[in-house]
């Protein structure tokens, strides 16, 4: 297998795209070794083969002696007037390669000509991608014209060397109370959003994009992996409405979008996360702090499982691919902070049948710095974001990183909620009257804390009618510290529901009292 280029090779080639052109005959070997950011024209120098078999998304191509393309090379063919890209997955013998199609194979016939590009799939990178939507092979799909850049980068790259990686610990303040207090995100870390269907993963991701663009002014890259096309379209238009992006891209846009949605073949869904990550890596290597969102990382695993079956590999546990850990590790190791810049990754992880022991979410756990677990029972109470304060974790919740006060308040909040959870069986059987006075007080405070963990979102304004709130970390700590100490025991429970700071809760309590009078 050819070794992927380091970012250094890429940067050099970006400066001189023309230099990457190789002699006609030796193009496949040379360009695949370099994997440089050549302009796409350089790709037209490779060997030509013929299609021998088409089975769904799997296409076999036969080449002449000595012209076999390398594993992971991109091959191109014309399918009913449109460009179809195939990625080499296996060498079968008799000069035949087995490839995975990045788009529909309807219309392909045996004997059809296929050209080796000599490179892996190359996608456009740089600021010209901001505000645009592209697909897995870097083609714009937003009907706003071509992406005006010659800089391209291979989607298969090596992870940064150990000496290039940074080890500083710093919090990324999101403005979402439950996240900042109980499971804070590391700048340059990997965060998993766990939850079943319909508990609010995508809404939380959209709120994070919105808050980070407003509060930090950083670039974001959003990879839509195997999710609903409607949601992708909604996200694009909401970004334009909220000012995160400008229509058609250009100056002022803060996010690049890379989509491979539910209706795409498994090849596109398995590679689109890498295409998005490649765009993010380019920003990082130029000194940016980038946010990389993946919705949904489970679909990446699911697509890999489909491909594995199509390629005839023996399935592993629960029918997943035998290379599940390898595939996940190859991608996750590239998401890291270097001495140049950082990639903070937020990955929505669908949990099949709400089972956290399923191999797909379980494999993802190993790579994460923080987990935000969304719980259906919390969503059923109408508390949004439906983040489980006891299940969500973060390695950043350490007094050496967040400070003694933040750590003490977070642990106190969790202990009150844990005590309430353990009392719920007694309450269900015997009722509140059988509890001691101390336990009654704990339950009352826990119910107020639960409601105070809710928060109106900017991106949900259209549904709720409540204006969104971005809460400062100091205000969050102050509010929960007072709640735990009993300073707000006199306020009614509804006053804490769907507010930002504690001052807003006090104001709401006054309004409720006035309405009752």
From Swiss-Prot:
It is found in: Cell inner membrane. The keyword Ion transport applies. It is a peripheral membrane protein. Its EC number is 7.1.2.2. Keywords: ATP synthesis, ATP-binding, Cell inner membrane, Cell membrane, CF(1), Hydrogen ion transport, Ion transport, Membrane, Nucleotide-binding, Translocase, Transport. F-type ATPases have 2 components, CF(1) - the catalytic core - and CF(0) - the membrane proton channel. CF(1) has five subunits: alpha(3), beta(3), gamma(1), delta(1), epsilon(1). CF(0) has three main subunits: a(1), b(2) and c(9-12). The alpha and beta chains form an alternating ring which encloses part of the gamma chain. CF(1) is attached to CF(0) by a central stalk formed by the gamma and epsilon chains, while a peripheral stalk is formed by the delta and b chains. HAMAP family: ATP_synth_beta_bact. This is ATP synthase subunit beta. The gene is atpD.
